[in-house]
Amino acid sequence: MKVSLFATCLIDLFYTNAGKATVELLERLGCEIDFPEAQTCCGQPAYNSGYVKEAKEAMKHMIRTFEHADYVVTPSGSCATMLKEYPRVFQGDREWESKAKALADKTYELTQFIVDVLKMEDVGAKLQGRATYHTSCHMTRLLGVKEAPFKLLKNVKGLELVPLPNAYQCCGFGGTFSVKMGTISEQMVDEKIEHIEEVNADYLIGADCGCLMNIGGRLKRQGKPIKVMHIAEVLNSR
């Protein structure tokens, strides 16, 4: 099965290990990985900031870049959501709406792809410790992927997965929200960290790098020993 990887900006710039883990994991599960080097940002930051015209140019470029892909898989619920939104953005545009839908229909978040397409829930991962999972807003509320990460994590050998209190509460990142509303964002992430500490977790696992960067950065500034891991890294652990 041939899979085209959409790496995302944050993985390219800050979380390269999560990108490598994604490739290694999918290859081990029998996928042939294609990485279109022309890929860029999906346009979400510009679109959410009101720069619709500029965002559409980025979206058109992405549509062209992945036009011939069989499957597009991304280790980001947020960016997968944005690609799924393309048909709505181009609604009424005769040239681009159908092309946008074609891309949206073959786009999957990583855990969604493994569970729903590859039909696997145990990938042979091993990681010792106690962990909790941060449920990101875009991935659950907009993309609708809720159970897939848990189905995979519960089969990681040696990992004790404990529920996170107020799991569906935002971590305060929200893309440009964390920049524009810094004080509120800080209060939100502090509350999230309190909940993580309540369960005495060794690891905080998530599927969106924006959330992990926000929570992980705050943990580091506070000198907390909790390790933050992208779910791809966990599933690739041996």
Swiss-Prot record:
Positions in coiled-coil regions: none
Gene Ontology biological-process annotations: lactate metabolic process
Example GO molecular function: oxidoreductase activity
Any single Gene Ontology cellular-component annotation: cytosol
Family, per entry: Belongs to the LutA/YkgE family.
Cited PANTHER family: LACTATE UTILIZATION PROTEIN A, UNCHARACTERIZED PROTEIN YKGE
HAMAP family documented for this protein: LutA (MF_02105)
UniProt function note: Is involved in L-lactate degradation and allows cells to grow with lactate as the sole carbon source.
Protein name: Lactate utilization protein A
Lineage of source species: Bacteria, Bacillati, Bacillota, Bacilli, Bacillales
